[in-house]
């Protein structure tokens, strides 16, 4: 399989740099995608992606890792809530928060719920970004299935959602706390002066050089004392190299 040719085509077609991904994992997953649709060569797969919109979206879902749910790993979110209350809200009345690679919006809305529960009626600034325009449109709607909200506490469910049929719809108060925008973690610059950056279960897919660059840029984007919250499989072993200290198992503080 001519993976380099495919990478170049994807970069030109979608402006997505697949060289950032772990090579063996990328190779296996692309072969899996190809086998599912019955094509045997990169050229055939490219032709399919050019003409079949549903397959283009499946490929983009694979690349942008669109798997998410509210309060994923609830006990870790409880730890984050404690840190927000005891550290961030003491120093700043209004917080600036970034949910990076936010997928369907469950993560930034989870953050909005936490902030509203801790400091009601304060207009914290939550920026939620993703590389996938289609998934951002879904996130803006704020409509979810039971499997996506299953970790939401009953008190939050009653207060922040309404149920219509099999849909759970986030209320306008929480929705209005989040601003969604398209952003590429690898290719585009980062905003500054964040109190909290949340990026979970994404960096694990990238090679080490790209990980290093992303963590350095996250550190640069945080205020001193700001927090980086990562996924349950993403411990940063060399966190000191990026200007962090460990605040807890999956939370790092900029020094």
Where in the sequence are the language-model features?
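A short glycine-rich, Lys/Arg-flanked "PGG" loop and its adjoining helix->strand segment in the class I
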Residues: 212-224
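Short hydrophobic/aromatic beta-strand or adjacent loop that forms the aromatic wall/cage
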Residues: 247-251
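Conserved SAM-binding loop of SAM-dependent methyltransferases across substrates and taxa
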Residues: 104-119
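Extended basic-aromatic, gly/pro-enriched interface segments that bind polyanionic ligands
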Residues: 124-198, 202-210, 235-237, 253-255
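Conserved AdoMet
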Residues: 2-95
